[in-house]
């Protein structure tokens, strides 16, 4: 079964503009693709057991983060990684969900929402607005 996750990005403060710089897909379940449709990022995956990541950077504040969305055992999941080093691209982070214990746990938790603050106190959140089925929707909120 093919899964899609449509993601809307909200930036709630003008103190640092985040721009998308990278999109990745994991290779399991026939991998996936990213599209942009009507201002939303749309991740299409070949089946359960894969994911995709978006990396955002703010040149204004020297901050970056990776937001990852996926389906595991037929349920959606999400995670956000902040305080990235230059070597921590979305490509690096995305593959860690399939073999690095701390990232594996985030995938296994199958959360419908997740929020975290970075070292500078900025908040980031993912909230799935459609949590079941094969046509999922989520909001990515940058505080």
Curated annotation (Swiss-Prot):
Q: Which GO terms describe its molecular function?
A: carbohydrate binding
Keywords, ordered alphabetically: Hemagglutinin, Lectin
Q: Which Pfam families match?
A: FB_lectin (PF07367)
Describe the function of this protein.
Lectin that recognizes O-linked galactose-beta-1,3-N-acetylgalactosamine, a disaccharide (Thomsen-Friedenreich antigen or T-disaccharide), present on cell surface glycoproteins. Can also bind galactose-beta-1,3-N-acetylglucosamine. Does not bind monosaccharides. Can be internalized by clathrin-coated vesicles after binding to surface glycoproteins. After internalization it inhibits nuclear import of nuclear localization signal dependent proteins. Inhibits proliferation of malignant cells without cytotoxicity for normal cells.
Quaternary structure per UniProt?
Answer: Homotetramer.
Q: What else is known?
A: Each monomer has 2 distinct carbohydrate binding sites, one for galactose-beta-1,3-N-acetylgalactosamine and another for galactose-beta-1,3-N-acetylglucosamine.
The entry's protein name is Agaricus bisporus lectin
């Amino acid at each position: 079964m093919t899964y899609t996750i449509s993601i809307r990005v909200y930036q709630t403060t003008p103190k640092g503009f985040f721009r998308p710089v990278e999109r990745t897909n994991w290779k399991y379940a026939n991998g996936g693709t990213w599209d942009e449709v009507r201002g939303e990022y749309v991740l299409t995956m070949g089946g359960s057991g894969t994911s995709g990541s978006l990396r955002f950077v703010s040149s204004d504040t020297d901050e970056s983060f990776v937001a990852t969305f996926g389906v595991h055992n037929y349920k959606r999941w999400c995670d956000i990684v902040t305080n990235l080093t230059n070597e921590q691209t979305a490509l690096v982070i995305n593959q860690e969900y399939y073999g690095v214990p701390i990232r594996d746990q985030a995938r296994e938790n199958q959360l419908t929402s997740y929020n975290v603050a970075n070292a500078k106190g900025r908040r980031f959140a993912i909230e799935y607005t459609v949590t079941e089925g094969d046509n999922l929707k989520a909001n990515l909120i940058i505080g």
